[in-house]
């Protein structure tokens, strides 16, 4: 059996070019297998050599057009994707955008996803008990008067708005009629509230026209009585041996403060919220994760390095930028590359006005003018001195 110090020195000696994280992972694995199988020094050296060989094989060749390859590798499987919005895997009650629309949403860095949702994991105390998980879900779920109402009526003669509350919904939300009235009274000073059993009568003080009454009724119906803003319904599901909450809508910053929530595992599909709350590195990881899971949902396989390159380009400046004319492509230094993408005439006019010069360093601009592209063998500029041929002396005639 080889000592740990020998393993460490062999890794440092033979795998000098390996990244630090690969070295540490290799050390941990060798340590484990050395204890289990009593490896010899020659076997350990052979393993390290194989790892170095595989690492060098995985490296990008100098001059490889990584951007073009990444675009093709993500673009080609995307043509086989569905264009529909499907139900979230295993949660039929919550709609979530999948397939190509979701990929477009991510790379366009849309501020508001079409179907925002959060996956809320719970702490040790709440994750194994359904009742406790539902208690946390009630704290998160946004409840409005409209959610509790069985029916709503406008009494145009007495200028009143009458709401029939559903007792079951009221109990499920953890509210009482007294709490509902108290919340409404603190928010709407310009109205009187009267309770008769499960009937709530609202009389606005300053509504002179029917249109005022209608407007006021809409405002009261949409008023949030409890829960987080931006979050609609919540679903509690059992996954493995623990309960997980899925939400329709997202409020990532506030959900992490809710007692009972595990902030280390809770996630949202809104990339901008992640960037704001957890920072740009977390947003980069979220972009990679969202694209990979969307592809896998459709049964498509893409090398993660292509997706990592896209995520790196989108988060390079410390903010989440879209790929497109308002982001990565729009900020290219080459006029011809920008013009080739979108709004051609405008780009050319603006460049002419400023007197911009295109140095033809990229792929697109060189393709446009018919020059060899500066990738692969096109990167090499050959310079050689030709031997000067000695001039023959003029023969005298």
Curated annotation (Swiss-Prot):
Xref: InterPro entries: DNA-dir_RpoC_beta_prime, RNA_pol_Rpb1_5, RPO1C
Top-rank lineage group of the source organism: Archaea
CDD domains reported in the protein's UniProt record: RNAP_A (cd06528)
Catalytic activity: RNA(n) + a ribonucleoside 5'-triphosphate = RNA(n+1) + diphosphate
Cellular component terms (Gene Ontology): cytoplasm; DNA-directed RNA polymerase complex
EC number assigned by the record: 2.7.7.6
Entries under SUPFAM superfamilies matching the protein: beta and beta-prime subunits of DNA dependent RNA-polymerase
Gene Ontology molecular function terms on file: DNA binding; DNA-directed RNA polymerase activity
Compartment list: Cytoplasm
Cited Gene3D superfamilies: 1.10.150.390
Enzyme class: transferase
GO BP terms: DNA-templated transcription
UniProt keyword terms in alphabetical order: Cytoplasm, DNA-binding, DNA-directed RNA polymerase, Nucleotidyltransferase, Transcription, Transferase
HAMAP family: RNApol_arch_Rpo1C
Assembly: Part of the RNA polymerase complex. An artificial construct of the RNAP clamp domain (including part of this protein) contacts transcription elongation factors Spt4 and Spt5.
UniProt family annotation: Belongs to the RNA polymerase beta' chain family.
Name of this chain's protein: DNA-directed RNA polymerase subunit Rpo1C
Organism: Pyrococcus furiosus (strain ATCC 43587 / DSM 3638 / JCM 8422 / Vc1)
């Amino acid at each position: 059996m080889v000592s740990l110090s020998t393993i460490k020195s062999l890794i440092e000696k033979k795998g000098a070019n390996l990244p630090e994280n690969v070295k540490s992972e290799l050390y941990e694995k060798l340590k484990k297998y050395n204890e289990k199988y009593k490896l010899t020094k020659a076997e350990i050296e052979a393993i390290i050599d194989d790892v170095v060989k595989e690492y060098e094989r995985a490296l990008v060749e100098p001059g490889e057009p990584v951007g073009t390859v990444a675009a093709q590798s993500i673009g080609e499987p995307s043509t086989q994707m569905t264009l529909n919005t499907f139900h979230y895997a295993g949660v039929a009650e919550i709609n979530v955008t999948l397939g190509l629309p979701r990929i477009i949403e991510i790379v366009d860095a849309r501020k508001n996803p079409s179907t925002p949702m959060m996956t809320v994991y719970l702490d040790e105390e709440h994750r194994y008990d359904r009742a406790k998980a539902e208690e946390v879900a009630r704290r998160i779920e946004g409840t409005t008067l409209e959610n509790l109402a069985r029916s709503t009526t406008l009494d145009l003669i007495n200028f009143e708005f009458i709401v029939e509350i559903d007792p079951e919904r009221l109990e499920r939300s953890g509210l009482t009629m007294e709490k509902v009235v108290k919340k409404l009274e603190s928010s709407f000073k310009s109205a009187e509230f009267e309770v008769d059993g499960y009937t709530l009568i609202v009389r606005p003080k300053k509504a002179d026209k029917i249109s005022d009454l209608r407007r006021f009724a809409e405002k009261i119906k949409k008023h949030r009585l409890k829960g987080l803003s931006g979050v609609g319904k919540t679903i509690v599901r059992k996954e493995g041996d623990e309960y997980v909450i899925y939400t329709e809508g997202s409020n990532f910053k506030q959900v992490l403060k809710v007692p009972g929530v595990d902030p280390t595992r809770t996630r949202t599909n809104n990339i901008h919220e992640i960037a704001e709350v957890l920072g740009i590195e977390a947003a980069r990881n979220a972009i990679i994760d969202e694209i990979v899971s969307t592809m896998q949902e459709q049964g498509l396989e893409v090398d993660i390095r292509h997706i990592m390159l896209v995520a790196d380009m989108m988060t390079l400046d410390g903010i989440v930028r879209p790929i497109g004319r308002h982001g990565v492509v729009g900020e290219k230094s080459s006029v011809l590359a920008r013009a080739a993408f979108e709004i051609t005439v405008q780009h050319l006019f603006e460049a002419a006005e400023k007197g911009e010069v295109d140095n033809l360093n990229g792929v697109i601009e060189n393709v446009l003018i018919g020059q060899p592209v500066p990738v692969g063998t096109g990167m090499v500029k050959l310079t050689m001195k030709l031997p000067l041929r000695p001039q023959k002396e003029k023969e005298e005639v």
